[in-house]
Amino acid sequence: MSSGVQGGPAAHANAYQTHPLRDAASALGTLSPQAYVDVVSAAQRNFLERMSQLASEQCDAQPAAHDARLDDKPALRAPQERDAPPLGASDTGSRASGAAKLTELLGVLMSVISASSLDELKQRSDIWNQMSKAAQDNLSRLSDAFQRATDEAKAAADAAEQAAAAAKQAGADAKAADAAVDAAQKQYDDAVKQGLPDDRLQSLKAALEQARQQAGDAHGRADALQADATKKLDAASALATQARACEQQVDDAVNQATQQYGASASLRTPQSPRLSGAAELTAVLGKLQELISSGNVKELESKQKLFTEMQAKREAELQKKSDEYQAQVKKAEEMQKTMGCIGKIVGWVITAVSFAAAAFTGGASLALAAVGLALAVGDEISRATTGVSFMDKLMQPVMDAILKPLMEMISSLITKALVACGVDQQKAELAGAILGAVVTGVALVAAAFVGASAVKAVASKVIDAMAGQLTKLMDSAIGKMLVQLIEKFSEKSGLQALGSRTATAMTRMRRAIGVEAKEDGMLLANRFEKAGTVMNVGNQVSQAAGGIVVGVERAKAMGLLADVKEAMYDIKLLGDLLKQAVDAFAEHNRVLAQLMQQMSDAGEMQTSTGKLILRNARAV
């Protein structure tokens, strides 16, 4: 029972499962193809050696100890009867005959294997010799061609050198001939100056002509030899280039032969076993991935280089457009300042003309001059305090529609008030015009600070208030007393004398320039007024022209600004394109990596399935 229990599990196991080489056989499924071939070849050699050893032992009538087998297991014997003779004693001859036959069979097998190996080796040797002979013939042919090309190039170089030496000598002869011509010419000129006889002059002239002929021939030979030398030099250069090409062909052939016959493992060693379909497909896809990745990298580099160059160009154009825009804006500002200065100069000239006209009219022209002076001073004060020039806002339409009526009304009211106070009519008109101009200038300065739209309203309110107050003042007793006080004050303070001196000065000025009659004064005043009007019109025209020029420059600046914005958009677009190229590159690599991962997973699954099938097959 104990023996049955001990051998219970092993009793039901077959011989394959308990064989000692079972683990070694299981390891065959994990070997590489080359290792598998090596293992099988070694096992075959060991088997043949073992069989030869057993055959020789049996031929020598020396049976193996304990009937040893190939796997070192005891030999199994068929059951025999107790009285039966031993099987070995009766079959000695048959054993010897079987061993001899096995030895003969092994010898034939080894001879066949050796013969096939020798035939294959001989065949490969013949192929090798033929290929070597072809390569040797090709190298010999290329070497001969290179030698011929070298010899021809050397001969051409020697010929070119000789031709160059001949051309150099011919050039020297030509220079010597030119020197002889110069000497003959000098002798002839000296003879002419000395007044030598005609026969002497004729001989010298003939010698000069002969020297010129020889010099021409020498120059012709020198030119011909120089052309021949140039031609031979070109031929030598062409042959040298051809020789270098032959040398390059020889070098390429030698390198190719060295690479082909120095590492021709396919002709000397058996080919490695082919891969399976899935493995080969995986290898092909791996190469494909490498090629695509390399192509993607090169494409990305080329796009990046292109976009970088385009961005650099657009940035340069943008900088140029920006500089042009700044120049146009600066030019427009300078033009505007220039036209403003011109307008101010013309305005001062008009003011001076108005003052000149005041000497002849004593009324409206002086008032205009005072208004111009007040406006000029007010313009400077306003520009210094607020930075705004109301002279640019209040031009001719304001003068015609507001200033003149306002000034005339204020002057009329003041003149009437002064006449009512007992002042002389002429002096009252002069003072009224001056005071009206001053009041109008003050009102306009205030209007410039308040706003141009309120000029008429402020002026009308000032006029109404002044008229009402003056009327009330003249009707009241205080007004009458004020008139008397003004008369006395004027007498005491010398205002009447001041007015008389002013009138006298104006009269002297009119006489000094030849204006005696009132009509002459009016004529000159009209002329000054016309001149002022013409200058005013010219000022307006120049200001308008300056405004047009400034507008044109600003339009050019706006065009440049549009180009700058367009260039900025192009740079942004190039950046977006470069980003898209990088994203596409990353997406391609991701797809390829995913594909290779799927192929690797499929190959791993196939390998796992094969291993599982082999395990199940061994377990049978």
From Swiss-Prot:
GO terms for biological process: symbiont-mediated disruption of host phagosome. Keywords: Coiled coil, Host membrane, Membrane, Secreted, Transmembrane, Transmembrane helix, Virulence. The chain crosses the membrane at residues 355-375, 401-421, 430-450. Residues 309-339 form a coiled coil. It comes from the Bacteria. The keyword Secreted applies. Residues 66-84 have a biased composition (Basic and acidic residues). It is found in: Secreted; Host membrane. GO terms for cellular component: extracellular region; host cell membrane; membrane. It holds the Pfam family SseC. The keyword Cytoplasm does not apply. Its main location: secreted. Belongs to the SctE/SipB/YopB family. Plays a role in the bacterium-induced formation of multinucleated giant cell (MNGC), which is formed after host cell fusion, as well as in the intercellular spreading of bacteria and in the induction of apoptosis in macrophages. May act in concert with other effector proteins to induce fusion of host cell membranes. This is Translocator protein BipB. It comes from Burkholderia pseudomallei (strain 1710b).
